[in-house]
Curated annotation (Swiss-Prot):
Organism: Escherichia coli O127:H6 (strain E2348/69 / EPEC)
PANTHER family cross-referenced by the UniProt entry: UPF0235 PROTEIN C15ORF40
Pfam families linked: DUF167
Classification via SMART domains: DUF167
Protein name: UPF0235 protein YggU
SUPFAM superfamilies assigned: YggU-like
Gene Ontology cellular component terms for the protein in this record: cytoplasm
InterPro entries linked to this entry: DUF167 (IPR003746), YggU-like_sf (IPR036591)
Gene name of this polypeptide: yggU
Entry similarity comment: Belongs to the UPF0235 family.
Coiled coil segments of this chain: none
Length: 96
């Protein structure tokens, strides 16, 4: 399975998360996943909520349209973005 998949109702992203980074960013490919650096620590779900907020801004969707499908407690996550309004250039490059 590739890092980014398009299906009927949106995008499915396979992510590798780097918590406690100096800034939020979509870094690029990390093996067969997209590496995302976020500033939040991996404590009490802070990293997950920060990730959902960050991805919501990147894809211009509400936080409720960013769904963590797999990997709630780990660095390797599968996230669904429902009906993205915009696709960040780092992700668009992986779709080609």
């Amino acid at each position: 399975m590739s890092a980014v998949t398009i299906n009927d109702d949106g995008l499915v992203l396979r992510l590798y998360i780097q918590p406690k980074a100096s800034r939020d960013s979509i870094v690029g490919l990390h093996g067969d996943e997209v590496k995302v650096a976020i500033t939040a620590p991996p404590v009490d779900g802070q990293a997950n909520s920060h990730l959902v907020k960050f991805l919501g801004k990147q894809f211009r969707v509400a936080k409720s349209q960013v769904v963590i499908e797999k990997g709630e407690l780990g660095r390797h996550k599968q996230i669904k973005i429902i009906n993205p309004q915009q696709i960040p250039p780092e992700i668009a490059a992986l779709l080609n």
